[in-house]
Amino acid sequence: QFKIGGKTINTKKVINAATDVAHAATLSDEDVAKMAKEYIQWMDTHNEVAGPDTEMGQRLERLTANVKKVSGLDLNFKVYNVVDVNAFACGDGSVRVCGGLMKIMDDDEVFAVIGHEIGHVVHSDSKDAMKNAYLTSAAKNAAGAVSGTVSKLTDSQLGDMAQALAGAQYSQKQEYEADEFGFQFCIDNGRDPYGMSNSLNKLLQLSESEAKSSKFMQMFS
């Protein structure tokens, strides 16, 4: 440590932040999967998970009973008992669906949304989003090198990443490709492929009656 302008600078943390930024640029699939596993554990802890004996838990199990692996990736599914109309998938194969989405969509629509989110993983979109979230955390680590400004990254890394991922946006091309994947995902599993367009239309209808800041549009933003 040394001082500039009366403030103590944590040189070790500055070096660690620089290392984090460099590392983020070369994250392997294994690195992302490990990070995703830690992230999903954090999310499962900070959100109420609907158990297998609940209506939503049983419904999700019925929907995904025959979908255990995609493109060599083992999948696991859970539903959060929250009002958000959202869903996401991570590089470790974890797929999470929010209760708010399940309440407004039928089975084919929910299945299509799940396929859409898995598409982001298969196309490495989720990996890129995780990299960007890691970079955001690394930037905060650098900012936190001045003692007393922000909490240490090691104390809030997962929270920072959760915040960054919640605000992540995919490109129009990435969304279109994920829609195509979701469409084919439905066909391959004997579901109505129009569940994809129906789910999108339902979101668009909701957007007309909800404030633009509402979280439900983040899923396809």
Predicted regions and their residues:
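A Zn2+-metalloprotease active-site environment signal
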Residues: Q1-S221
